[in-house]
Amino acid sequence: MAMKIRLARGGSKKRPFYRIVAADSRMPRDGRFIEKLGTYNPLLPKDSEERVKMDIEKIQAWLDKGAQPTDRVARMLEAAGVREKTERNNPNKAKPGKKAQERAEEKAAKAAEAAEAADAE
């Protein structure tokens, strides 16, 4: 049984509220879960203590049993100091896309032509 520590959505339309739960990965997102481990209320300010509440002992027990946290829950656990922060690497993020590179090359070529024309005069 593949266990996940994930967010189960509650609340009403436009008013989300999440439970942090340990659930079988094959169950629906908001469906059956094994144990409730905490809550997350994204409507509260980021500095509010009530925004994320977690039972750290229960979460650590599930992690020791082999449960895998989802990406969002993993970030919450990193912020709480339960897990070490994993290094995220996206080397292509800083590079411009194809069209932007083409535009930059065209602009550089025009600038070079203008510089040559200015030198020729």
Curated annotation (Swiss-Prot):
Tagged with keyword Amino-acid biosynthesis: no
List every stretch annotated Disordered: 80-121
Question: What are the cysteine partners in each disulfide bond?
Answer: none
Q: Tell me the leader sequence span.
A: none
Instruction: Give me any GO biological process, just one.
Output: translation
Q: Which UniProt keywords apply?
A: Ribonucleoprotein, Ribosomal protein
Q: Does the keyword Amino-acid biosynthesis apply?
A: no
Q: Which residues fall in a compositionally biased region of kind Basic and acidic residues?
A: 81-90, 99-110
GO function term, MF aspect, one: structural constituent of ribosome
Among SUPFAM superfamilies, the record links this protein to: Ribosomal protein S16
Q: Which domain of life is it from?
A: Bacteria
Any single Gene Ontology cellular-component annotation: cytoplasm
What the entry lists under InterPro entries is as follows:
Ribosomal_bS16, Ribosomal_bS16_dom_sf
Which family does the UniProt entry place this protein in?
A: Belongs to the bacterial ribosomal protein bS16 family.
Specify the protein name.
Answer: Small ribosomal subunit protein bS16
